[in-house]
Amino acid sequence: RNDLYAGYKDGAGMEEAILLQIPVMEDALTAAGFTVWPMVTHEADDALGAAAAVADADERVEQVLIVTPDKDLGQCVRGDRVVQFDRRKREILDEEGIIAKFGVGPRSIPDYLGLVGDSADGFPGLPGWGAKSASAVLAVYGHLEDIPPAAGQWEVPGLRGAAKLSATLQSQLELAVLFRRIATLDRILGGRLTVNIISSD
């Protein structure tokens, strides 16, 4: 993701003393019985998404709880089987909860973030596109490529500024697609994961 977009978050600014503690922390967690997955080309969110997908596919697992408030993890939610938990707000979001919060379903979350951006990950989205406009348009069309090129073709009731939004999208569609790619989690991770691997029991 850093190679795709220069503004994407990185470890810059992290004190060297903290960086030096990471291997020590990994060893301590492993010794305590926790599963540790050191990664170079992937991030923690990819690992969470991959683990959730593996657990979802295992019939022995009753429910998958993804414990993070990060917006991009919303794409992993499925029905009430794979849910997202924000422990600060004590809020559990199933698929209906994701729709209520963002105005779009889990499959459209990367497209949504491609339009509005994600400040936590360091990409801005498109100018003029906010949460309301993105959710209104994507609730109808689902994905960036399915949005008609001309605002006159849009069937989005009550949307203001459609012409300007459409012009911005058409002129910066490649950028929106790039941001969507950044927001899309790798939930396969080379097929290396199993429930037995991700379990600390």
Model-derived features: where do they sit?
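Non-catalytic nucleic-acid-binding/docking modules located in mid-to-C-terminal regions
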Residues: 14, 34-35, 60, 89-201
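Noncatalytic, basic helical substrate-engagement surface that gates or grips nucleic-acid strands
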Residues: 1-67, 72-83, 87-92, 175-178, ...
